Regions:
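Helical element adjacent to the flavin cofactor pocket in flavoenzyme catalytic cores
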Residues: 147-182, 193
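Short hydrophobic core segments
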Residues: 24, 186-196, 330
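Glycine-rich FAD pyrophosphate-binding loop
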Residues: 39-58
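C-terminal catalytic lobe of FAD-dependent flavoproteins
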Residues: 281-350
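Active-site substrate-recognition segment that forms the wall
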Residues: 35-39, 66, 96-98, 196-310
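Short beta-strand to alpha-helix junction loop
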Residues: 74-84, 105-110, 147-163, 258-262
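Dinucleotide-binding Rossmann-like beta1-alpha1 core, especially the glycine-rich loop
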Residues: 63-135
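N-terminal Rossmann-like FAD-binding beta1-loop-alpha1 element of flavoenzymes
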Residues: 21-45
Length: 350
């Protein structure tokens, strides 16, 4: 899809090259903002309230799926538009990003949901049992049919975020961890990527809890995320390095911390349903994060240009699409900063 059909060209640059830009929040949204702006020649400082491990942030607990076709089942068209552009940016900036596709499977009792998923999405090929076994030998004989989305990808959040931070520094930017700041504390143009921490300035922002479990086993080998149809929400098993797998993810409309017993049972049950060998896997970690979401579950870039005050850009509301959308939203911000271009589906001017 052509992103430029939604753009309105502005009159001039908002921040000239080499001008200071302060970005608050070093999660996936802020990291991509910092990377593209630093590579464009701006003097970027990225502030993060957490330490470099960033266990407090939503990014730490993310799935890292780059799956615009699968997400189209329950998402607005803008998610597909931005997601397709983001895939190109992932390939450009991090060429080693794996694009092995996604596989959707279901048990016979969930066949109606499986067929609905197929109707609601594009970009897939139907596989029979032999086709599933060909691309995922560990699943041989486990499922009779699946939907294969060959152009989708995935990243490992706890590895890719430090890599983005390294590239920001290599591009001339700086990162200050353990440094909690407010927009009024910063120099130059301010880009607010605090996620749920910005709720007081970004109403009606809410937190949607997503829970995950990290397990380890060498009894199962997978090359791509596996989505298992489920009556309440799609559950998935995502392969990670060193024989590890991420199980996710719930989507719960409350902001409590931790993982509930019910959610843990559903996530572990999904893994067992994909392959019984997961029953002997070791549980390494479990936790939850709060996805920042507006009432329509769509991302927004809010631009504030008061007559006498600090210019601020707030990027928020990525909901469950943080890794998918962050690069495209960063590019929209860059286009606005460099030439005043506005995307009228995403950007709001105050």
């Amino acid at each position: 899809m052509n992103q430029t059909t939604h753009a309105v060209r502005g009159e001039s640059a908002i921040a000239p090259p080499n001008s200071p830009i302060s970005i608050i929040g070093a999660g996936i949204a802020g990291a991509w903002q910092a990377l593209l702006l630093a590579k464009a020649g701006h003097s970027v400082t990225l502030y993060e309230r957490d330490n470099a491990d960033m266990r407090e942030g939503t990014t730490h607990w993310g799935g890292g799926m780059l799956a615009p076709w699968c997400e189209a089942e329950v998402s607005e068209p803008i998610i597909m538009r931005l997601g397709l552009r983001a895939l190109d940016l992932w390939r450009k900036e991090l060429p080693d990003t794996p694009f092995n596709g996604s596989l959707v499977i279901a048990h016979p009792r969930d066949r109606a949901d499986f067929e609905r998923f197929a109707r609601m999405t594009e970009g897939h090929t139907r596989l029979d049992a032999a086709g599933i076994a060909e691309i995922e030998p560990s699943l041989e004989g486990r499922f009779r049919e699946g939907l294969f989305y060959p152009a989708e990808g995935h990243v490992e959040p706890r590895r890719v975020l430090p890599e983005l931070h390294k590239r920001i520094i290599a591009a001339g930017g700086s990162i200050k961890f353990d440094c909690e700041v407010q927009p009024d504390d910063c120099d130059g143009l301010v880009i607010d990527c605090r996620g749920i921490w910005a709720r007081d300035d970004a109403t009606p922002l809410r937190g949607v809890k997503g829970e995950m479990i990290l397990i380890e086993t060498d009894e199962v080998q997978l090359s791509r995320p596996i989505r298992l149809m489920h009556p309440r929400w799609p559950l998935y098993v995502i392969p990670r390095a060193d024989n590890r797998f991420m199980l996710g993810a719930t989507s719960i409309e409350n902001e409590s911390s931790g993982v509930s017993v019910r959610s843990a049972l559903e996530l572990l049950g999904a893994a067992y349903a994909v392959h019984p060998a997961f029953a002997e896997a070791r549980i390494l970690d479990l936790g939850s994060g709060l996805r920042p979401a507006f009432s329509d579950n769509l991302p927004k870039i809010a631009i504030s240009r008061p007559a006498n005050g600090r210019n601020t850009i707030a990027v928020n509301g990525l909901y469950r699409h943080g890794f998918l959308l962050a690069p495209a939203l960063a590019e929209l911000t860059l286009n606005y900063v460099q030439r005043g271009a506005l995307d009228n589906e995403v950007m709001q001017c105050k």
